[in-house]
């Protein structure tokens, strides 16, 4: 049996843009994608820490070193530039894979630069 597990997340990302008149998706700095092990067109969940909104979309790679986190299309109605979000990727793992899987947690600062890389999310609140 396969179960769904978090594979990686970008924690405390700051929304830089919200573009309502785009087809859809989230644009993320490609350096951040590499750090988190996320890929273009991968399905992700977005959690807005400012208003509690949760949504799903897919990734479009953004310009490297730009720090871009841009919600596009209808998702732009649920975020504002400056909002803090968590971007979570999930994967289907077998029981055996799940026992050895270590998710990547990339903690960002307010400029969307990598502040900390965590091999496994600690059992405490990250401030």
UniProtKB/Swiss-Prot annotation:
Q: Which residues cross the membrane?
A: none
- Report the GO molecular function annotations: aspartate 1-decarboxylase activity
Return the Pfam families for the record: Asp_decarbox
- Active site feature: 25 (schiff-base intermediate with substrate), 58 (proton donor)
| Modifications the protein undergoes after translation, according to the UniProt entry | Is synthesized initially as an inactive proenzyme, which is activated by self-cleavage at a specific serine bond to produce a beta-subunit with a hydroxyl group at its C-terminus and an alpha-subunit with a pyruvoyl group at its N-terminus.
Listed InterPro entries: Asp_de-COase-like_dom_sf (IPR009010), Asp_decarbox (IPR003190)
| Alphabetical keyword list | Autocatalytic cleavage, Cytoplasm, Decarboxylase, Lyase, Pantothenate biosynthesis, Pyruvate, Schiff base, Zymogen
**Record localization:** Cytoplasm
Q: Which residues bind substrate?
A: 57, 73-75
Q: Which reaction does it catalyse?
A: L-aspartate + H(+) = beta-alanine + CO2
- Tell me which GO cellular component terms the UniProt record holds: cytosol
Positions carrying Pyruvic acid (Ser) are 25
Keyword flag Cytoplasm: yes
Class of this enzyme: lyase
Instruction: Report the co-factor binding details.
Output: Binds 1 pyruvoyl group covalently per subunit.
First-listed, main subcellular location of the protein, grouped into a coarse class: cytoplasm
Q: How does it assemble?
A: Heterooctamer of four alpha and four beta subunits.
Q: What does this protein do?
A: Catalyzes the pyruvoyl-dependent decarboxylation of aspartate to produce beta-alanine.
Record-given protein name? Aspartate 1-decarboxylase
Species for this entry: Bacillus pumilus (strain SAFR-032)
Q: Which gene encodes it?
A: panD
